[in-house]
Amino acid sequence: MASTAETIEFPGLDKPDGLSIRYAFSVSLFFEERVIIDSPSQRAFVPPMGGEVWGPRLNGRVVPYSGADYGTVTGLDASYAIEAEDGALIYVMQRGFMKRLDGGTFWTAGAPRTPGELPRQSFADAANTPVPMRVRPAPLFDAPVGPHDWLGRTIIIGHAQRHSGPDHTLFTYYEVL
């Protein structure tokens, strides 16, 4: 297999003719607090407080507290709802991968807790700074029949940038054509 920065050849396999992507929309998700399960994967429970959706293919808002991110330090595992500007409710099931690029930690240690109190932790990064990481989401959508049902028939891929203070993530999504 020969490879350069511009091309990758796979002997015996056909190239995917006409494969391209087109910007579809962006989503900002805002979070208030994170509950971290103290395990090797550092699984979190993080409900979205809300957010916005904008772009050429979809506009609206993230329904506050409509789901949660149950991700780990390396994976996305979130479900939440979007309310489109026409009032349609769209279910989002987001999976994907993320990797911290600077070797830093994701969370600061929470204060000591008493039995029955949930462990809460916050971002380890300074306020109002992008978190240096690579995020690759691949969401699935369940939308009602009508102007948004294209979401259920389209492969969507994206990238994201996490920010601290306020704690939020900005997702940018593309439809695979």
Predicted regions and their residues:
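Beta-strand-enriched cores of mature, soluble protein domains
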Residues: 2-177
